[in-house]
């Protein structure tokens, strides 16, 4: 017998819906450029909001095209490929939208004192963009975790083994 939690599939967005979300972000202003890079990290690499909020320059190895970090939630190390579109979005943010600050966090607020985000603020900006995107949300949560589930669903559709998906998402076990 399954309990209710086990029998429900996590909500997720299709690849087209994720594309629509990304396409709906206004890249004509600094907040949009920043938010696009943040949402791309979540949608394409499956990073948790806490790991995006905590991302530092030292976590990005541009030469080897790798992001290495210690996950906030689990304390476990995680190494992911720095995908070309993700890298380009981060570079665009750093060159054209990031305020001048000595913070070692990649993503900072657009108003002084330019502090880094907390995970709730990252989740909040994802929610705002999901609501503005025009995506049909009935039965789907509007949060960053749903973007992680969406990545997992797409990987499953491409027959990526579950242990590999768990590793990508930084889960401790596949159960």
Regions found by a protein language model. Name each.
Residues 1-175:
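Conserved catalytic core of the tyrosine transesterase superfamily
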């Amino acid at each position: 017998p399954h309990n209710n939690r086990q029998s429900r599939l996590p909500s997720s967005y299709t690849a087209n819906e994720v594309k629509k979300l990304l396409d709906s972000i206004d890249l004509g202003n600094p907040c949009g450029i920043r938010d696009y890079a943040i949402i791309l990290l979540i949608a394409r690499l499956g990073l948790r909001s806490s790991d995006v909020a905590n991302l530092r320059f030292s976590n990005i190895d541009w030469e080897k095209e790798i992001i290495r970090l210690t996950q906030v939630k689990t304390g476990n190390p995680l190494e992911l490929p720095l995908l070309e579109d993700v890298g380009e979005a981060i570079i665009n943010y750093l060159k054209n939208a990031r305020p001048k600050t000595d913070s070692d966090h990649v993503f900072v607020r657009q108003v002084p004192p330019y502090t880094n985000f907390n995970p709730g603020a990252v989740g909040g900006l994802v929610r705002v963009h999901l609501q503005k995107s025009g995506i049909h949300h009935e039965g789907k949560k509007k949060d960053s975790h749903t973007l992680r589930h969406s990545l997992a669903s797409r990987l499953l559709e491409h027959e990526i083994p579950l242990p590999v998906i768990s590793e990508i998402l930084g889960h401790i076990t596949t159960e």
